[in-house]
Amino acid sequence: MQAKATAKFVRVSPRKARLVAQNVKGKPVEDAMNILRFTPQKAGGLIFKVMHSALANAEQLPGIDVDAMVVKQVIINEGPTWKRFLPRSMGRANRILKRTSHITVILEES
C-alpha cells in the first residue's frame, strides 16, 4: 500500500531539489529522514517536511506497518516561475527568474 504527500509552489529551484531527492530514493524512511535532516541544502528541509506528511498519511491507513516504509519515489516537478527585474546602469534591467517546485513523496510498504 502507498502513502503520498505533495507540496506545491515551494520556493526552491527544481534542479537543486532533484540533487537532494536522489539521495533518498529507495531507502527506508528512517534513513531517508536522517539524511534529509542533516543535509545543508534548503531543499533537504523542504523534502523532509513533505516526507513527514506522507508518513503521517500512512499512519491513517489501516493495516500499514509504518516502520517498514520505504521511499518509492520523490518527484520534483517544475512550478510556475516568478519573473522579477533588477535595475542596472544606463536604464537597463536584468531579468531574475525565481523558480518554484512541486514536491511529491510516495512511500511504500516493503
From Swiss-Prot:
The keyword rRNA-binding applies. It holds the Pfam family Ribosomal_L22. Transmembrane segments: none annotated. Keywords: Ribonucleoprotein, Ribosomal protein, RNA-binding, rRNA-binding. This protein binds specifically to 23S rRNA; its binding is stimulated by other ribosomal proteins, e.g. L4, L17, and L20. It is important during the early stages of 50S assembly. It makes multiple contacts with different domains of the 23S rRNA in the assembled 50S subunit and ribosome. Belongs to the universal ribosomal protein uL22 family. This is Large ribosomal subunit protein uL22. It comes from Oleidesulfovibrio alaskensis (strain ATCC BAA-1058 / DSM 17464 / G20).
